[in-house]
Amino acid sequence: MPSEVTPKVPERPSRRKTSELFPLSGSESGDIKANSEPPTPAGTPNVPTRRPILKAKTMTSFESGMDQESLPKVPLQRPVRRSTTEELNNVMNNTSKELEEIESLISKHNIHNVSRKKSPTSVEEGKVAAIHQNGQRSASDNKTSTNPSPLEKNEHEGAEGNESAISPSNLVNKSNNEVTEHSDSEDLTEKQKVHAALDNEAGDRSHFEEKLIPGDMKVQVDVSKDVEEGSLNALPPSGITESDDKAEKFTKHPESSLEELQKHQEQQEEKIFQNPTDEESTTSLNEKQEGKDNMEVNSQPQGPSDTETVIAATSSNVPSQIASEEENDVPVIPRSRPKKDFEAHVQKEELPNTQEKRVSEECDSTLISTEEESKIPKIPSERPKRRAPPPVPKKPSSRIAAFQEMLQKQQQQDLHNNGNSSATTASADIAKKHTDSSITSDTTKADFTSKLNGLFALPGMVNPGQLPPSLEKKLSSPDTESKLGPQDQSQAKTGPLGGTRRGRGPRGRKLPSKVASVEKIEEDDNTNKIEIFNNWNVSSSFSKEKVLIDTTPGEQAERALDEKEKLPANAESDPLSQLPQTNTVGNRKAISEESLSPSEAITNRDQNDTTEIQEQQMEEQMEVDMERELSGGYEDVDSALHSEEASFHSL
């Protein structure tokens, strides 16, 4: 391929690099300058590459531009808060002096005639003074800084830009002030002079309080971050809201303003040391006036001077906040009582009286009209309509009518039967009461069950009104059965039982053969079967004790040895079972001689006690034999019988 067709790859674009916080080496800084963009023309303002670090917003930075600190000093110890009780006690003790001082101030300044509102011309002149002081403060800061840092340079540039932007407005304000100087000087009254004096005292006192506060306990004040950076360096002092006369002086003589301020501050400090209570009593009123002035200044924006008025408002509020925080606990006594407006009060009192009269007249007229209307009879325009007849009920269907008739008949029958049964029971009870006197105690016990009326149910006992048909037939007499015809009996037999129900299964299908072949059980109610069985049997046998009595002691010993050999374990384990046998030998000998059959013993039980004794002994013997069989003394029952027969034959 030829060289002309090959595409050219462009160079990779270099990224812009801003200046970092830390300085770079010489080679790196050279590369950055080479790759950076060409410088901007000289006519446009220089924009800083990074935002300057905000200075410490302490009281010194707002009021004294000479003493600017980088960081606020944190106090080592927390300030001790004074209790309110101590301050109140001090106020109570020193009230007489304060009252005298307040009276002297009132007599000096004639505060009764002071008006709270300022004229618009004085507000405009205060703005001009604030703008002029900002320019002077920025100039003094630039002179005092011998070795300015790059951050300070940027701040001064921003301040100069702001001054250049504000300059046309300053010229306009100056021209307006020159025109209005003559008119203002003529219109100034005693009230405005008093305002000016109070404003001067408030500003000087705020500056003096800053000096009194130690360095370790300076109060931090937060200012909104929306304020422009250039205007932060040119913050005005706290005493910016001064009188109209001083604003004019500052505009005419800008060079001598600083010297006059210093002299005035020294004079105010001496006054405060001499009578501090005067200043404390006047600060509350001055603060209120300053707040109103700042609100008026903020409510009248005038182009580029808006930012300066906002700054002036924030700076003037700072000392007032500190003073209010210090004097929150001290009660403020008003200079004068408010006067009542007697004319307005009289008008207010007259208005409700007139309204009440009008309301009462209207009520009287309405009452009279209602009474007249009630006397006049009214003829109705329309006749009242007659009520419609009640709706005729529909005839029920034949099935519903038949069902209702059947229910009525059943209810009547039930009522008739209940009445007869109650009458019969009452007559029976009366007859029983008459016969109870002649019946003995045995008959009273027999009648006890009849008085219970079925409270205690016996086995098989059912309420007579709910007996099943099978039991009714058994309990009924044969006369009633004979009265019933063969048809009724067949119906009773074929009637279904209450417990049997048809099992619900799948319809339309045949049942399985196993289920279909099952035969149903039919109960024969009229048949009775008798079964005879033996409850108990009595079997008699010869006892071994009788044989032992007839034998000699030598033969008894031999038989005992033979039994021990056959039953070594059982004979040793049950030695006590043989003791009652030896003890009752004499008794059983007498019983055996007079042995009776069980039937004769039962018949003669009540006549003779010997039969009872014999029965007890027989039971004991049977128990002993059963224990031997269960314990395994004999292997089989046959072996036990053979042993008994052998002992019998030996006799």
Curated annotation (Swiss-Prot):
Residues 1-85, 110-522, 549-651 are annotated as: Disordered. It is found in: Cytoplasm, Cytoskeleton, Actin patch. Its main location: cytoplasm. Residues 133-149, 164-178, 296-323, 414-427, 437-452, 575-586, 594-605 have a biased composition (Polar residues). The keyword Phosphoprotein applies. InterPro entries: Aim21 (IPR021582). The keyword Hydrolase does not apply. Interacts with ribosomes. Interacts with ABP1. This is Altered inheritance of mitochondria protein 21. The modification Phosphothreonine is found at T18, T58, T85, T277, T552. The modification Phosphoserine is found at residues 36, 70, 104, 183, 206, 231, 284, 324, 592, 595, 597, 599, 639, 643, 647, 650. Keywords: Cytoplasm, Cytoskeleton, Phosphoprotein. Belongs to the AIM21 family. Residues 9-19, 179-213, 243-272, 339-361, 372-383, 471-482, 556-567, 639-651 have a biased composition (Basic and acidic residues). Residues 383-396 are annotated as: Interaction with SH3 domain of ABP1. Involved in mitochondrial migration along actin filaments. Residues 110-119, 501-512 have a biased composition (Basic residues). One of its GO terms (cellular component) is actin cortical patch.
